[in-house]
Amino acid sequence: MLERRKAAGEYPEADLVFVSPMRRCLETAEVLYPGQEPVVVEEFRECDFGLFEGKNYRELTGNVHYQAWIDSGGTLPFPEGESRGAFQDRCCAGLVRMAGICAEWERAEEKKGTGRRELRSACVVHGGTVMALLERFGTEGGDYYSYQCGSGQGYRCVAGGSPEEIGKGEIELSCIHPLVFSQDLS
C-alpha cells in the first residue's frame, strides 16, 4: 500500500526526513523517501507501554491494571511504563531538537546564495508521537485522541516560531490537515 501511494505522489516531498529509531519507522522511511539519509530522533521512540507491551485488548481483558487504564480514559500511566505526560515531554523535546536541525539547514541554504526557501521536512513516527506533538504544539485546539491516524497516514502542518521561541520550546504547528489519499489505493 505504501509503495502504491508513494508512486501516486500522495506523500509530500521532503528535504529532510526525521524518524523514530524503531525499525518499522526506519523501513517505512526507506520506502517513502528512498536514498535519503534519515535523521534519527531518539525522542520520537514509541511510548513505553510497560506491562501492556506487545499485547492486544483481548490478551489484556480481565487485567485489573488494563481495566483501570481504560476506565481512566487512557490518562493513567502504563503500569511499569511511561505516563502520557512523560511521553509527550520526551516527544516535544525531540521536536525542539528537530527544529534546531531544520534551522541549521535553512542557514546553510541561505549561505549557498541560492535564495532562501522554506524547508520541507517529513517525520516518519508512531501515531502516539503524532498525537503528542499536535496536542502540545497544534494551534487547532484538538486533544490527544483527536489526532489519531492509521498506519501510513499522518498530517501536513506548518511549523512556526522564531529561533529564540524554538530554543525555548515555543513552536506552533498550524494549518494541520490530514494527508488525503486516493480512494482507489486503499
Task: Tell what function each PLM region has.
Residues 6-8, 88, 92-106, 110:
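Generic structural signal for well-ordered alpha-helical scaffold segments
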Residues 14-21, 109, 115, 120-124:
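Short glycine-rich phosphate-binding loop at a beta-alpha junction
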Residues 31, 35, 97, 101, ...:
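Active-site catalytic microenvironments for nucleophilic, acid-base chemistry
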Residues 47-58, 104-119, 132-186:
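Acidic, low-complexity terminal tails and accessory targeting/binding regions
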Residues 32-92:
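Phosphate-handling substructures
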Residues 2-8, 25, 63, 108-110, ...:
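A generic local structural motif
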Residues 1-36:
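Active-site-proximal alpha-helix that buttresses catalytic centers in soluble enzyme cores
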Residues 127-131:
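GST superfamily/GST-like fold recognition
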